[in-house]
């Protein structure tokens, strides 16, 4: 598997009058005593520092292999470069970068910023979307019981008893009155419907609103009550 790595070259020229950099050849002791682990860490994780300054003063020519990679650090005393590649590969994995030149004098300085390409890699990412399901709050109607039973046996039932209690809270009319209306109109059947179009516990007409749920039916009955009072149910 091929791997692309960064190699950077930085050239520095000083324009201060009377100042020059003298060449220096590295001795064996200068290259063998270098901290190779530190150089590996810089090349792999901190290339900016290698671009900013040479690894040591003077000229040097450092080459070594570590953990399957060939590392190269060279300088002629005024220019330096570094690179690393897979050791023993028949392909060159060193990518040259733009040179940075810094000119300095006693009055002004001009800097051309170096553009360094980041390593490229093929990366696969998988994304999962979370799904949240929502359910309408449910009510336990079994806790409500009707206290009204008509002579024909009709009652408001547990759902009707709940609806009657809600209407009593909204209108101030007793819950037993609303249970009586529900027992007479629908026998406590939530989905009761007749040919006139009236539907639900309170047998309200479509103009008063939806009767799809218990709360819808309570809202529709309340609208009818606000408009006509109990006369909406012939009382």
Curated annotation (Swiss-Prot):
**Polar residues bias locations:** 95-115
Q: What class of enzyme is it?
A: hydrolase
Where in the sequence does UniProt note compositional bias of the Low complexity kind?
A: 117-147
User: GO terms for molecular function, please?
Assistant: hydrolase activity, acting on glycosyl bonds
Key words of the record: Glycosidase, Hydrolase, Secreted, Signal
Q: Where in the cell is it found?
A: Secreted
Annotated stretches, region: Disordered: 95-150
Gene Ontology CC: one annotated term: extracellular region
Report the EC code(s) recorded for this entry.
Answer: 3.2.-.-
Keyword Lyase in annotation: no
Signal peptide as annotated in the record? 1-28
Family matches, as InterPro entries = Lysozyme-like_dom_sf (IPR023346)
Which branch of life, at top level?
Bacteria
> To which protein family does this belong?
Belongs to the transglycosylase family. IsaA subfamily.
Q: What does this protein do?
A: Is able to cleave peptidoglycan.
Kindly provide the name given to this protein in its UniProt entry: Probable transglycosylase IsaA
The species is Staphylococcus epidermidis (strain ATCC 35984 / DSM 28319 / BCRC 17069 / CCUG 31568 / BM 3577 / RP62A)
């Amino acid at each position: 598997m091929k791997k692309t790595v960064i190699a950077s070259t930085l050239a520095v020229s000083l324009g201060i009058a009377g100042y020059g950099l003298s060449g220096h050849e590295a001795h064996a002791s200068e290259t063998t005593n270098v901290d190779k682990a530190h150089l590996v860490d810089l090349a792999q994780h901190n290339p900016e520092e290698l671009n900013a300054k040479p690894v040591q003063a003077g000229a040097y020519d450092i080459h070594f292999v570590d953990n399957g990679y060939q590392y190269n650090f060279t300088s002629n005393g005024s220019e330096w470069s570094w690179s690393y590649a897979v050791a023993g590969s028949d392909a060159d994995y060193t990518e040259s970068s733009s040179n940075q030149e810094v000119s300095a004098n006693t009055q002004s300085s001009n800097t051309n910023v170096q553009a360094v390409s980041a390593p490229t890699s093929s990366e696969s990412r998988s994304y999962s979307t979370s799904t949240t399901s929502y359910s309408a709050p449910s009510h336990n109607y079994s806790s409500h019981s009707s206290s009204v039973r008509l002579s024909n046996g009709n009652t408001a039932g547990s759902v009707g008893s709940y609806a009657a209690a809600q209407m009593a809270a909204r209108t101030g009319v007793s819950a037993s009155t609303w249970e009586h209306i529900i027992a007479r109109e629908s026998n406590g059947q939530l989905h009761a419907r007749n040919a006139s179009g009236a539907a639900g516990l309170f047998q309200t007409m479509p103009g008063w609103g939806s009767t799809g749920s218990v709360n819808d039916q309570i809202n529709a009955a309340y609208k009818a009550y606000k408009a006509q009072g109990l006369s909406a149910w012939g009382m």
